C-alpha cells in the first residue's frame, strides 16, 4: 500500500522530503527543521533530489483508470492496525490496576500450576488491604509509574522531533529553529543528530541483537 503523491511537476527544482511531499528547492537546508510557505519539512539537507525520470528510483504503478502515477513512500496502515492496538492499549492500562490476584491460588483451585506470569498479573494496588498499606502501595505504584511514563514521553518527544507531522499546531512555535544557534558546538550536535537518525533509520539496533 502506497500513499498517492503524484508527481505533477517534473524537474530538478523539486525534491521529495521525508514525508513524500514535494518541497521547492529554495528551502534553507541548514536547519534540521526548515519552514516553508506551505509548511514545515524535516531533514531536508540529507534528502537526495530526484531528477528526470523518477520511474527508475521509486517505481511506477498503474491505477484502475490506466494512468501511471508515481508514489513517494509507503502508506501507513489504517484501521487494520489501529483497532488491535487500541485493544492492547486497554489491557495495558488496566492490567496493572485490576490484574488477577493469585493469593488464594493453590492446589485447591488448580491455579497454583499456572503461575508463570503471576508476578505480572498480580495487582499493584490491593484494595482488600488496610488503608495504611493501601496508601503505601499507591505511593509505590505511582512512583514506579513516573519513571516508565517519563521514559515513554521522552521517546515520543524524540520521535516527534524526527518524524513529527508538518501539519501539527507545534509548527507555529518554531521550536527547533529557536534552539538552533550558530556556535562552535552547533555543527558537532548536528552531526550527532544525523548519525543517530541514520543509525535508527537503518535499524542498527536490530543488527546488534542479531549479531550477538
Swiss-Prot record:
Catalysis performed (reactions): a plastoquinone + NADH + (n+1) H(+)(in) = a plastoquinol + NAD(+) + n H(+)(out); a plastoquinone + NADPH + (n+1) H(+)(in) = a plastoquinol + NADP(+) + n H(+)(out)
**Transmembrane stretches, start-end:** 82-102, 145-165
Top-level lineage group: Eukaryota
**Keywords of this entry:** Chloroplast, Membrane, NAD, NADP, Plastid, Plastoquinone, Quinone, Thylakoid, Translocase, Transmembrane, Transmembrane helix, Transport
Q: Which EC number(s) are documented for this chain?
A: 7.1.1.-
Localization terms from the record = Plastid, Chloroplast thylakoid membrane
Record-linked InterPro entries = NADH_UbQ_OxRdtase_chlpt_su5_C
**A cellular component annotation (GO) from this entry:** chloroplast thylakoid membrane
- Tell me, what is one Gene Ontology molecular-function annotation carried by this entry? quinone binding
Protein's membrane topology: Multi-pass membrane protein
- Role description: NDH shuttles electrons from NAD(P)H:plastoquinone, via FMN and iron-sulfur (Fe-S) centers, to quinones in the photosynthetic chain and possibly in a chloroplast respiratory chain. The immediate electron acceptor for the enzyme in this species is believed to be plastoquinone. Couples the redox reaction to proton translocation, and thus conserves the redox energy in a proton gradient.
Description of how the protein assembles with itself and partners: NDH is composed of at least 16 different subunits, 5 of which are encoded in the nucleus.
What family is reported?
Answer: Belongs to the complex I subunit 5 family.
Please state what the protein is called: NAD(P)H-quinone oxidoreductase subunit 5, chloroplastic
Originating species: Avena fatua
Species lineage, top-down?
A: Eukaryota, Viridiplantae, Streptophyta, Embryophyta, Tracheophyta
Q: Which gene encodes it?
A: ndhF
